[in-house]
Amino acid sequence: ASQSSAHGYQPTGGTPELRQAMAHFYKRWYDVDVNPDTEVLPLIGSKEGILHITLALCNPGDKVLVPNPGYPTYTSLSKILGQQIVNYDLSEDNGWQPDFDALEQMDLEGVKLMWTNYPNMPTGGRAMRETYERLVAFAKRHNIVIVNDNPYSFILSEERLSILQVPGAKECC
């Protein structure tokens, strides 16, 4: 209590030490280099991140691809912010992975953002490297930003996968 440096609010972007620790974590567990100064932002929870990303990348009227089933916050925040929700279906028949043939047939004009969620909630479907590779290629082909929400990856899978392991992913994720 007697040290003035122990009081006050943390920097909005988190302390450099925390961001550096997060970058080391990503390197250790996913073998992905992230710049702690420009590519790491500590958050108080997923909803804050979903809001920040949507506000930064989408305007009212823009379209957002949302998995069905998926985390309800993707839909609710986009609706509040005036975006159009375009659902893409996930099916147990293909392991809860996106149906890329169906996605390619959709009207993608005006789509700015695509939410993915692996391990998938609520289904528990696990990520596959091939899915991440196809998502990156899809995003580049259609100029869409992919945001992969990666919850529970240490609980539901022993394989450590990140979409950022795919070459070129940082260009569209």
Predicted regions, residues:
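Short acidic capping loops at alpha-helix termini that bridge into adjacent secondary structure
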Residues: 34-40, 60-63, 110, 170-173
